[in-house]
A protein has these predicted regions:
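C-terminal motif of bacterial Sec signal peptides marking the signal peptidase cleavage site
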Residues: 17-19
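Bacterial signal peptide processing site
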Residues: 21-23
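Ankyrin repeat A-helix N-terminal signature
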Residues: 40-46, 73-79, 106-110
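Terminal, low-structured helical/coil segments at or just beyond the last alpha-helical repeat
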Residues: 113-131
Length: 131
């Protein structure tokens, strides 16, 4: 009888210890964002810095004080590879800035097709749709 009681108490204690264990908070992203902002990196076509921002969890749709996203900057400076990377990582091709203009409105010929192929519309088209 003593053996059963000791076994039962030991089992209950073990269950309580396991059930009361604290869980570890999720670990932060292992990559660290570079010193340069994602907007400036996109403006400069610094694809490596953009990749590091993405790895660190930076939002590719973040807007600066003028409402420009990194894609606005990449499109305006004809940085095709940077624009493609941003789009592949979820950049919204139809975000409008404070002037009501989308990345497509700033695009040059070389990048125009990339944006159109990914559903981009001009600021005027988006305004007509009520966006």
């Amino acid at each position: 009888m003593k053996l059963i009681l000791i076994t039962t108490i030991t089992t209950i204690a073990a269950v309580m210890l396991v059930g009361c264990a604290t869980t570890q908070p999720p670990s932060p992203p292992t990559a660290k964002a570079p010193e340069i902002s994602i907007h400036k990196a996109a403006y400069q076509g610094n694809i490596e810095a953009v990749k590091r921002h993405i790895a660190a969890g930076t939002d590719v749709n973040t807007q600066d004080d003028s409402g420009w996203t990194p894609l606005h900057w990449a499109a305006s400076k004809v940085h095709n590879k940077t624009a493609k990377l941003l789009i592949e990582e979820g950049a919204d091709v139809n975000v409008v800035n404070k002037d009501g203009l989308a990345p497509l409105d700033y695009a040059e010929n070389q990048i125009f097709g990339v944006l159109i192929d990914n559903g981009a519309k001009s600021g005027a088209e988006l305004k007509a749709e009520g966006k």
